[in-house]
Amino acid sequence: MNPPPPPSSGHWFESDPLWFKKAVFYEIHLRGFFDGNADGSGDFRGLTEKLDYLEWLGIDCIWLLPMYASPLRDGGYDIADYYQVHPDYGTIDDVKTFIEASHERGLRVIADLVMNHTSSDHPWFQRARQAPAGSAERDWYVWSDTNQKYEEARIIFTDTESSNWTWDDVAGAYYWHRFFSHQPDLNFDNRDVQEGMLDVLRFWLDLGLDGFRLDAVPYLFEREGTNSENLPETHDFLKRV
C-alpha cells in the first residue's frame, strides 16, 4: 500500500523508496505548536502558516502525533473516529490544505496511527458491547466470559491497571485491553477488522499522507501460551499494510 509521491521539488528522497531511513523528521504535537485561529490550541491552520519556517530548518518530513477525533484521555492515542480530526485542530479540509502546502515545499508528512485499540467511545465499540454474543458486530473486539485467558501477557500499565481484562455490564462479558481500560483492543483475528483498518490507511493515503508510524502493533493478536506480543500473525498482517 504505497502513497503517491509528492510533486517533484528536487529533494533527494523523491526517487528513493527507502527515503525514511535517511530523512530528518520533525515531530509535532499539534495542540502545542501554533494557534492559527486564536482559540488557545495549536491547529492545522497554524501549522500551515509555519511551513516556511519548517522548510528553513532543513527537515525532510513532518511527523504528526495523533490528530484524530478523540476524548483525549490518552493524548489522542484513544481514537474515537479514524476518519475525522479533533475539532480543536481543524477540519479534514484544513488537513488537505496543510498536506498540499507541505508537498509544494518538498516536505513529506506522516502521522501516528493506533491500530491495536480504539477509545471505548468509538462507535465500533459501542456497537460491539450492545450486540449479541457471537454476532458480527460483537466480534470486532476481544471478549471473554472469564478474565483468566492469556495470563502470560504482561500488564503494561501496572500503576493503573490490575488486569488486561475489564468487565462490561452492557455486554455482560470481559473485554481485552493491553493499555488502559478505556482503550479496548480490536480483534485482528476478524478479517473485517483487518479490512476496516486497511480502509483507514487508504483514506489517509488518498488524502495525501506519505506514511504512518504504526503505534502499538506488537499487540495485535493474542494466543494462549505466549506473551501475545510480536506474534507471527502480526507480521503476516503488517505485510499487507
Segments the model singles out, each with a brief description of its role:
Residues 2-190, 194-198, 206, 217-241:
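Acidic/aromatic-lined carbohydrate-recognition and catalytic surfaces
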